[in-house]
Regions:
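Alpha-helical tetratricopeptide repeat
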Residues: 4-20, 33, 47, 51-52, ...
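Single-residue signature of alpha-solenoid repeat helices
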Residues: 32, 66, 100-101
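A conserved position within tetratricopeptide repeats
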Residues: 37-40, 74, 108-109, 116
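Short coil turns that delineate tetratricopeptide repeat
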Residues: 44, 78, 112-113
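Alpha-solenoid helical repeat scaffolds
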Residues: 51-52, 82-87, 102-103, 116-123
Length: 127
């Protein structure tokens, strides 16, 4: 049986493949969500899994649910740059006032990225 760390490493690799295989985007998203939910069933406070699930949900347009999950990782004390960046991305997508999401971007600058997490997609040209 694979360790949680190995499973998260595979999630990061699979997430990168979404962008290379857009024809299979939905199928890969479903696999990512299932794997992350399985990890969270074993370790409900795994902040890397929460951050990645929030990113996948954001990429799927489920921003309110993504924000709730990401804020859970904040409440658990995560100091991952990708967490705070992802919260800002979700807040932009939800149309929240810039002064609110700028706080998260500023906080993100104080941390480093965990290699077991990834950023949600953000298209600055869409705004």
């Amino acid at each position: 049986m694979k360790s949680i760390t190995q499973r998260l490493e595979n999630v990061v690799k699979l997430q990168a493949k979404r962008w290379e295989n857009e024809d299979y985007w939905d199928d890969i998203n479903d696999l990512l969500i299932k794997e992350l939910e399985d990890i969270l069933a074993l370790e409900p406070q795994n902040t890397s899994a929460l951050i990645n699930l929030g990113a996948v949900l954001s990429d799927s347009g489920e921003n309110e649910n993504a924000l709730k999950i990401l804020k859970t990782a904040v409440d658990l004390g995560s100091e991952d740059k990708n967490l705070y960046t992802n919260i800002a991305i979700v807040m932009v997508d939800l149309g929240i006032n810039p002064e609110h999401y700028h706080e998260y971007l500023e906080t993100a600058e104080n941390f480093t990225e965990n290699p077991l997490t990834f950023k949600a997609f953000f298209d600055p040209n869409a705004y």
